[in-house]
Amino acid sequence: MQNWIDNSFQAEFEQESYFGSLGENSTNPSSGGDRYPEALIIRDITGKTSAIYFDITDDILENDPHQTILLSPIENDIWTEKDVIIDTYRYINELIFCDEKSQQKQKDRTEFIKKEQLQLISNRNPDHYRNLWNQCENCFIPNYKKVLKSNMQICEECGSYFKMTSSDRIDLLIDEGTWNPLDQDMVSLDSSEFDSEAELECYEDNIKEWNEEMCQAFMRKLSKDLKEGQALERTANLIEEPWLPEYIQPEEKVEEWTKPDLDEGEESQDEERWIWELDKGEESQEIEDSEANDEDDDDAPYVERLAFYKKETGLLDAVQTGVGQLNGRPVALGVMDFRFLAGSMGCVVGEKITRLIEYATNNLLPLIILSASGGARVHEGSLSLMQMAKISAALYDYQSNKRLFYISILTSPTTGGVTASFAMLGDIIITEPGTFVAFAGPRVVQQILNETIPEEEQEAEALFEKGFFDLIVPRHLLKNVISELLNLHAL
């Protein structure tokens, strides 16, 4: 703007300024016709003419240095050079400001339309079409599943990683046609009987038998130590009047004590039930409370949940193990699947991984395990925790005694007992960008320590700086990086 002013007005211009209507069919504003854009004409000494057009309705400014159309004379004779500079400067500033505002409005409108389109797509697509798409958790853009699989489960919009199934991981790493699964028919039979109803019924029967035996033992001891009259007298003193109607004789009540008869399944709510019935104890009450809680609990029994995830994922448990070739090199591979009960480690998972390690040990194969787990499986109790020690012991023999090569690959998320055992025991530990790795999640830590942990503190990039991993490898480079590591170790 300053250069234009210097070139236009400080070089001794001869100003001949006009306002007029342009075009062949232009109409003079004073004639009452349609108004066309107004123009300011400036001509220098050499005769070169510059025209500036002003469209008041659309706020458009144009500068035409080749304009030669004759215009009507200026209507205001008081118009000076200074006024021209000031007004021109003002108009240009206003138009620049309007342009910035319009760009911001256009940007906001574009974002709004984008959101509306996503919402429209979501509303229009019925349920039987939605399974064809996966929505990115980072940018919320839907990705077509077939394209997503060919793109290694990487979002086309923002490049963030989707969770991969165990089968997709195997296809990514193992050469086509070389995969041979191991122990694929091994299933869990609820070894801890976490939700066993038969065990609960047996426990109730034991409590009833125990109560009956205690009652009989009490009566035998009472009859042995005291004479019949003393027993009746002491018993009558123990019983309050509301419990002993006047028409019932004490002798009849004693006989009733010695012959308790409760129908199976009958609840004790009558105040006239005898003492042996009231002494069922806290354990029996806890069982009744647990039954009530189980009825109110929405979670299905463990056996039913296993059946559901088997049908949902097509897997028998949360890990696939086997042998195959990686760029022509034989390897033993174990891949956990987070879809099956959050990839939790139970007896089957621990046994399959242990057998895989033993197979690799006996056949002198390099071992690769990809972890994706929520930790030990609480449904199997201490048996699931024992898998940590069992796998670690097998790895000790594999690494220390046989001096073989174990690569641990951590995928998102890897937490709990898996992180505390074989996931962090690799000779080389690799992870993907943005992987969530922790022993306990932010919610658990906050409840225990009353401290809030930022999410990025438990991601791969932050943990890599603290020495948790050896490599952070993008997904599309993972196979070649593993192949190079195997070459370096002469395996």
Swiss-Prot record:
<dbReference type="GO" id="GO:0016743">
    <property type="term" value="F:carboxyl- or carbamoyltransferase activity"/>
</dbReference>
<comment type="subunit">
    <text>Acetyl-CoA carboxylase is a heterohexamer composed of biotin carboxyl carrier protein, biotin carboxylase and 2 subunits each of ACCase subunit alpha and ACCase plastid-coded subunit beta (accD).</text>
</comment>
<dbReference type="GO" id="GO:0009507">
    <property type="term" value="C:chloroplast"/>
</dbReference>
<dbReference type="GO" id="GO:0005524">
    <property type="term" value="F:ATP binding"/>
</dbReference>
<dbReference type="InterPro" id="IPR034733">
    <property type="entry name" value="AcCoA_carboxyl_beta"/>
</dbReference>
<keyword id="KW-0444">Lipid biosynthesis</keyword>
<feature type="region of interest" description="Disordered">
    <location>
        <begin position="279"/>
        <end position="298"/>
    </location>
</feature>
<dbReference type="InterPro" id="IPR029045">
    <property type="entry name" value="ClpP/crotonase-like_dom_sf"/>
</dbReference>
<protein>
    <recommendedName>
        <fullName>Acetyl-coenzyme A carboxylase carboxyl transferase subunit beta</fullName>
        <ecNumber>2.1.3.15</ecNumber>
    </recommendedName>
</protein>
<feature type="compositionally biased region" description="Basic and acidic residues">
    <location>
        <begin position="252"/>
        <end position="262"/>
    </location>
</feature>
<feature type="binding site">
    <location>
        <position position="139"/>
    </location>
    <ligand>
        <name>Zn(2+)</name>
    </ligand>
</feature>
<keyword id="KW-0067">ATP-binding</keyword>
<comment type="pathway">
    <text>Lipid metabolism; malonyl-CoA biosynthesis; malonyl-CoA from acetyl-CoA: step 1/1.</text>
</comment>
<comment type="similarity">
    <text>Belongs to the AccD/PCCB family.</text>
</comment>
<dbReference type="GO" id="GO:0006633">
    <property type="term" value="P:fatty acid biosynthetic process"/>
</dbReference>
<feature type="zinc finger region" description="C4-type">
    <location>
        <begin position="136"/>
        <end position="158"/>
    </location>
</feature>
<dbReference type="InterPro" id="IPR011762">
    <property type="entry name" value="COA_CT_N"/>
</dbReference>
<comment type="function">
    <text>Component of the acetyl coenzyme A carboxylase (ACC) complex. Biotin carboxylase (BC) catalyzes the carboxylation of biotin on its carrier protein (BCCP) and then the CO(2) group is transferred by the transcarboxylase to acetyl-CoA to form malonyl-CoA.</text>
</comment>
<feature type="region of interest" description="Disordered">
    <location>
        <begin position="252"/>
        <end position="273"/>
    </location>
</feature>
<dbReference type="GO" id="GO:0008270">
    <property type="term" value="F:zinc ion binding"/>
</dbReference>
<dbReference type="GO" id="GO:0009317">
    <property type="term" value="C:acetyl-CoA carboxylase complex"/>
</dbReference>
<feature type="binding site">
    <location>
        <position position="136"/>
    </location>
    <ligand>
        <name>Zn(2+)</name>
    </ligand>
</feature>
<dbReference type="GO" id="GO:2001295">
    <property type="term" value="P:malonyl-CoA biosynthetic process"/>
</dbReference>
<keyword id="KW-0479">Metal-binding</keyword>
<keyword id="KW-0276">Fatty acid metabolism</keyword>
<keyword id="KW-0275">Fatty acid biosynthesis</keyword>
<feature type="binding site">
    <location>
        <position position="158"/>
    </location>
    <ligand>
        <name>Zn(2+)</name>
    </ligand>
</feature>
<keyword id="KW-0862">Zinc</keyword>
<keyword id="KW-0443">Lipid metabolism</keyword>
<feature type="domain" description="CoA carboxyltransferase N-terminal">
    <location>
        <begin position="132"/>
        <end position="491"/>
    </location>
</feature>
<dbReference type="InterPro" id="IPR000438">
    <property type="entry name" value="Acetyl_CoA_COase_Trfase_b_su"/>
</dbReference>
<keyword id="KW-0808">Transferase</keyword>
<keyword id="KW-0934">Plastid</keyword>
<feature type="binding site">
    <location>
        <position position="155"/>
    </location>
    <ligand>
        <name>Zn(2+)</name>
    </ligand>
</feature>
<keyword id="KW-0863">Zinc-finger</keyword>
<dbReference type="Pfam" id="PF01039">
    <property type="entry name" value="Carboxyl_trans"/>
</dbReference>
<keyword id="KW-0547">Nucleotide-binding</keyword>
<dbReference type="GO" id="GO:0003989">
    <property type="term" value="F:acetyl-CoA carboxylase activity"/>
</dbReference>
<feature type="compositionally biased region" description="Acidic residues">
    <location>
        <begin position="284"/>
        <end position="298"/>
    </location>
</feature>
